[in-house]
Each structure stands twice: as C-alpha cells, then as structure tokens.
Amino acid sequence: MTDSTHPTPSARPPRQPRTGTTGTGARKAGSKSGRSRAREFALQALYQHLVGGNDATAIDVFTRDLSGFHKADAAHYDALLHGCITTAQYMDELIAPQLDRKMSEISPIEHAVMWIGVYEFQHCQDVPWRVVINECIELAKEFGGTDGHKYVNGVLNGLAPQLRATEVAADKAAARG
C-alpha cells in the first residue's frame, strides 16, 4: 500500500554502458585515430628502450611486427620513437624542474609518456597543446599506474606555457573573454 502524498520514487533507468572507452576511461582501440595508435606503439617502444636499453632499430623491428601496427600512423610513430630517443637527454632536462622527485624514481611508463608530450609540444605544431596533454593522459591511464595520469598532466601543464607560449597565452586570453 502506498501513501498518495508520498509517491514512490521512480526507479532510475539502467545505466547505459559508455561506448568507446575501457574500464579506466581510456578510449577503446576501435575508436582510436592512427596518430593515437602511433603514440601507443611509440610508448611501448620507448618503454623497451628505457627498461631494457635496447637499440632503437631493434625495438622498431619488433614493434612493427605487433598486432594492429598497420592501423597506426607509421610516420608519426617513427618521429616519436626516433625523435624521443635522439633528444632524450634534452627532454629530461626540460622535464626535471617540473618533478617533485628524482627522474630515476619516475615510472618508465610515465617517463616515456612525458617524452612523447614534450616531443609533440616541440615538433608537432599541428597538434594543439591541449590535445597533446589529453592524448598523454589517455596513454598514462591505459598503461600507467593508478594516478600516473595526474602526474603526467601536472608536468605537461607546467611545460606547455614554456614550450607552446604563444598558443597557451592565446587560449588563456580567449577563455577570459
């Protein structure tokens, strides 16, 4: 028996599953662009370089044989892998002042993701700075530790005004109205 003055709350409709994302909120493979896939493969290759000290050529041969590589933007992958390895010391010098710990204490996944972000800030001017950060956050969510994406976000947000000064300033001015 229900009281007519207090109607029973209507049941919520069943929650609709989010399409295009994994349980961590990262995008599913089917909804990723060729560049996003290239970043994933570059991350895996850079991880091998950081952890195993493997040569870029050997890593490249191995990575190109992985399932799904044919869907990646191979030119972007090449630029990321070889560009990050070639400029690693310089990128670490840019990243280090943003860290709250020694570089050696940073997870190799987060380290590689930050390299990708710094490289794209410097060499991929066609990719907006916010997109660079968002793509790196997605990589850290999918491959990194529990809160690694927050750390990557903080570091890259700290570097963006330095590496993309004009673009960041224009965005902030536009946001102020």
UniProtKB/Swiss-Prot annotation:
Instruction: Supply one GO BP term.
Output: transcription antitermination
Q: Which Pfam families match?
A: NusB
Keywords for this protein: RNA-binding, Transcription, Transcription antitermination, Transcription regulation
Composition bias, Low complexity:
17-28
Query: Example GO molecular function term?
Result: RNA binding
Which positions form S-S bridges? none
- Give the UniProt entry's GO cellular component terms: cytosol
Please state which protein family the record places this protein in: Belongs to the NusB family.
Q: What is this protein called?
A: Transcription antitermination protein NusB
